[in-house]
């Protein structure tokens, strides 16, 4: 089993944890229906960039 030689510093621990936070998803409003959706994703109606894709 691997055992560390030195105790990691508070700085190194913080740098490792710097990406562990939860991000709020970026939202966009559809031009045609006005529906709010996640950026770069289709809406529930099947529209993407104002065009019907599904």
From Swiss-Prot:
GO terms for cellular component: large ribosomal subunit. It comes from the Bacteria. Keywords: Ribonucleoprotein, Ribosomal protein. GO terms for molecular function: structural constituent of ribosome. GO terms for biological process: translation. Pfam families: Ribosomal_L32p. NCBIfam families: rpmF_bact (TIGR01031). PANTHER family: 50S RIBOSOMAL PROTEIN L32, LARGE RIBOSOMAL SUBUNIT PROTEIN BL32. Belongs to the bacterial ribosomal protein bL32 family. This is Large ribosomal subunit protein bL32. It comes from Buchnera aphidicola subsp. Baizongia pistaciae (strain Bp).
């Amino acid at each position: 089993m691997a055992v560390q030689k030195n105790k990691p510093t508070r700085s190194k621990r913080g740098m490792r944890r710097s990406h562990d936070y939860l991000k709020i998803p970026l939202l966009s409003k559809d031009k045609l229906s006005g529906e709010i959706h996640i950026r770069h994703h289709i809406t529930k109606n099947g529209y993407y960039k104002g065009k019907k894709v599904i």
